[in-house]
Swiss-Prot record:
Protein's cellular compartments: Cytoplasm; Nucleus
Chain segments carrying region Disordered: 1-24
Binding site for an acyl-CoA: 59-63, 85, 104
Listed GO MF terms: fatty-acyl-CoA binding; lipid binding
Predominant place of localization: cytoplasm
Pfam families: ACBP, Ank_2
Source organism phylogeny: Eukaryota, Metazoa, Chordata, Craniata, Vertebrata
Listed GO CC annotations: cytoplasm; nucleus
Encoding gene, per UniProt annotation: acbd6
InterPro entries, per database record: Acyl-CoA-binding_protein, Acyl-CoA-binding_sf, Ankyrin_rpt, Ankyrin_rpt-contain_sf, FERM/acyl-CoA-bd_prot_sf
Annotated ANK repeat ranges: 182-211, 215-244
Listed Low complexity bias regions: 8-22
Disruption phenotype: CRISP-Cas-mediated knockout results in gastrulation failure due to reduced cell movements. Animals surviving to free-feeding stages have craniofacial abnormalities, decreased head size, structural brain abnormalities, eye abnormalities, and decreased movement. Proteomics analysis shows decreased protein N-myristoylation.
Sequence ranges assigned to domain ACB in this UniProt record: 32-117
Name the UniProt record assigns to this protein: Acyl-CoA-binding domain-containing protein 6
Length: 286
């Protein structure tokens, strides 16, 4: 789905930007926020003993306090860790900042029973930022920034560098159906990242629209799972088969959380439009 960089949260700045009550029930706002900030800084000391579920629990509440209700797009299909974090935050909905901070503090206490927030903190060095507080994410792998000379066609595809990809395909330097180690072709990647125009370019160059990766998933599976309705519609119009199943037996409409996309796929399959000749639909994008 598009794939974002490492999610970083700073422990500085105003909490509860998403809107919190002006008065807390049991603790003053200043006291509660101070304890929350201390807990966020202490996370780096207990991250190694926390389970994945606990880290996700902390992450979601940290984001709820710092940002408020989840306001970012769902991460890409390849970004498993990012999706889990997004889902944990999204599930909180309009959760109150007070409750989120209290639960965050209590969870840190459970991870380290000997720790308790202090009334006043001693001067400290700025901590590294992290998953649910300070520290590099335990679940997210950092992607290196590649030098231009080190990039390959898949890097240009992920970046939506249409000019580079088009030139490589037009000159025959690259096979449009070349696949990576996981069997994912350029069309898989473009669908995953939501690059609609690039998808059109790849289809114009005769990309295999029903190509399956090592998991048996087609570009249509990717576009459906990542919830890009425009790309789903584009693929269907160009002959994508919505009845193909992946290695787990799932069709594209079964891997999406979007009711609209699922309905679109099921309706298309019912009318048999996937048999429409793709050659009649291909046009070079402007």
């Amino acid at each position: 789905m598009a794939s974002p960089g490492v999610l970083e949260e700073s422990s500085s700045g105003e909490a509860c930007s998403g809107g919190c009550p002006e008065q807390w029930d049991e603790k003053t706002e200043e006291e509660l926020q101070g304890q929350f900030e201390q807990a966020a800084k202490h996370v780096q000391n207990v991250a190694s003993v926390a389970s994945t579920e606990q880290l996700l629990f902390l992450y979601a509440r940290y984001k709820q306090v710092k940002v408020g209700r989840c306001n970012t797009p769902k991460p890409g299909f390849f970004d498993y860790e990012g999706k889990k974090k997004w889902e944990a935050w999204k599930a909180l909905g309009d959760y109150s900042c007070q409750q989120a901070m209290n639960e965050y503090i209590e969870t840190v206490k459970k991870l380290d029973p000997d720790w308790s927030p202090q009334a006043l903190e001693e001067p400290h060095k700025e901590p590294k930022t992290t998953f649910g507080g300070p520290v590099v994410s335990c679940l997210y792998k950092v992607q290196e920034t590649l030098r231009e000379e080190d990039k390959d066609i898949f890097d240009y595809c992920r970046e939506n560098n249409i000019s580079r990809v088009s030139h490589a395909l037009s000159t025959g330097a690259i096979d449009v159906n070349v696949a990576d180690d996981e069997g994912r072709c350029l069309l898989h990647w473009a669908c995953d990242r939501g690059h609609t125009q690039l998808v059109s370019v790849l289809l114009f160059h005769n990309a295999h629209i029903n190509m399956q990766d090592s998991e048996g998933q087609t570009p249509l599976h990717y576009a459906s799972a990542c919830e890009f309705p425009d790309i789903v519609d584009l693929l269907l119009d160009h002959g994508a088969d919505p009845s193909l199943v992946d290695n787990d037996g799932f069709q594209p409409h079964e891997v999406t959380d979007s009711k609209n996309i699922a309905a679109m796929l099921q309706q298309h399959a019912s009318y048999g439009e996937h048999n429409k000749p793709a050659s009649l639909l291909l046009e070079m994008p402007q």
